C-alpha cells in the first residue's frame, strides 16, 4: 500500500501508467493531486482543470478510480484516513483531488486520535519472507481469467452503490441548484446565503466523491428548475456528470473562472440570468 502526492501536470507525466498497473494488479494506493491552473507547464495558481483526468481513469484500459474532493484544510487531513480505508476495502487506487487554493491555505486543523491498524490482517499484503509462510505473489495479469470482467464490473457496481458522498445545502426547495466541489463549493455556499437573503431560492450540492458521482444527491431537488456548475476551469468539466445525474431533464449551465476565484455576487447573477433565460 502506497501514497503519493503530486500537483497538476506531474499527474499525467509521472503517474497514469502506474495507476493503470495498480488496478490491473488489484492493489490499494492513495494518490493526491493538488489541482492547479493551465495546460502544459501551467501555473501554481488556483485551478480545477484536472476533473476529467481524475474521474475518467486517465491511463490505458478499462478502469475508474475512487476520487475524494476535500473542501478545507481539515478535510485534506481527514480524507487521507478515508482514502486509505477505501483503498484497502476495495483493493483499489483512491485519488484525493484537492486544489491549489486549499493547498496554499492556512487553517486550523484538529488531528484525530490514532486508531490501531492491523497491518497483517490481509492475506494479499506482502510482508517479507517469514519462515513457514506461504508465498505471496503480486501479479497484474488477472485479466486473463475468464471471470475477471464480471469481477471488475461487480467491484465498480459495489463502489457506486455504497460510496456516493455529498453535502446538500438548501437544495431541496431551490429554484436553481449550484453544483461545486473543493474551494468552489465554499464560495458557492456564500453565494447561496447571499441569494437567500435577497429572497432568491438558490441551493448547493457539493460532491464529496467525484467518482462515484453522487447521483443520489439530485433526487432530493424536487423544486429545481435548473442546475449550474461552478468550477475554476474553462470548459465546465463537471457539466456532463450533472447532466447524467439529472437524466437531461433540466437545463445544466456552467459558470467558470480561469485566473482567479469565482465571486459570490457573480455566481448569484449568473444563476438569476440562467433562470431568466430558461423562462422559469
Label for each model-derived stretch:
Residues 230-280:
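Peripheral docking tails and interdomain loops at the edges
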Residues 165-201, 205, 211-217:
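Redox- and metal-dependent alpha/beta enzyme cores, enriched for Fe-S-associated oxidoreductases
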Residues 15-20, 40-47, 78-81, 105-112, ...:
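Short acidic, glycine/serine/threonine-rich loops at helix termini
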Residues 15-70, 119:
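N-terminal alpha/beta PP-like core and its mobile active-site loop of ThDP/TPP-dependent enzymes
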Residues 91-168:
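Conformationally flexible catalytic loops at phosphate/diphosphate-handling active centers
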Residues 45-100, 279:
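Conserved thiamine diphosphate
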Residues 1-8, 12-13:
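Single conserved hydrophobic/aromatic residue that forms the stacking wall/gate
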Amino acid at each position: 500500500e502506497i501514497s503519493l502526492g503530486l500537483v497538476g501536470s506531474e499527474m499525467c507525466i509521472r503517474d497514469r501508467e502506474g495507476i493503470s498497473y495498480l488496478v490491473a494488479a488489484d492493489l490499494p494506493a492513495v494518490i493526491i493531486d493538488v489541482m492547479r491552473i493551465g495546460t502544459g507547464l501551467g501555473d501554481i495558481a488556483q485551478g480545477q482543470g484536472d476533473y476529467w483526468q481524475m474521474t475518467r481513469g486517465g491511463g490505458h484500459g478499462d478502469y475508474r478510480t475512487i476520487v475524494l474532493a476535500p473542501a478545507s484544510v481539515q478535510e485534506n487531513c481527514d480524507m487521507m484516513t478515508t482514502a486509505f480505508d477505501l483503498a484497502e476495502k476495495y483493493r483499489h487506487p483512491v485519488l484525493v483531488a484537492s486544489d491549489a487554493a486549499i493547498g496554499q491555505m492556512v487553517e486550523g486543523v484538529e488531528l484525530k486520535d490514532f486508531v490501531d491498524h492491523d497491518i497483517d490482517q490481509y492475506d494479499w499484503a506482502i510482508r517479507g519472507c517469514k519462515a513457514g509462510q506461504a508465498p505471496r505473489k503480486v501479479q497484474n495479469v488477472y485479466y486473463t481469467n475468464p471471470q475477471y470482467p464480471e469481477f471488475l464490473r461487480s467491484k465498480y457496481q459495489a463502489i457506486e452503490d455504497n460510496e456516493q458522498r455529498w453535502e446538500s445545502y438548501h437544495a431541496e426547495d431551490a429554484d436553481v441548484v449550484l453544483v461545486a466541489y473543493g474551494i468552489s463549493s465554499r464560495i458557492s455556499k456564500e453565494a447561496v446565503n447571499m441569494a437567500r437573503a435577497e429572497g432568491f431560492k438558490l441551493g448547493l450540492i457539493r460532491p464529496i466523491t467525484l467518482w462515484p458521482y453522487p447521483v443520489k444527491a439530485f433526487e432530493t431537488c424536487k423544486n429545481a428548475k435548473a442546475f449550474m456548475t461552478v468550477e475554476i476551469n474553462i470548459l465546465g468539466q463537471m457539466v456532463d456528470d450533472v447532466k447524467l445525474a439529472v437524466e437531461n431533464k433540466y437545463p445544466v449551465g456552467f459558470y467558470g473562472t480561469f485566473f482567479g476565484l469565482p465571486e459570490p455576487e457573480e455566481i448569484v447573477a449568473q444563476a438569476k440570468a440562467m433562470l431568466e433565460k430558461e423562462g422559469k
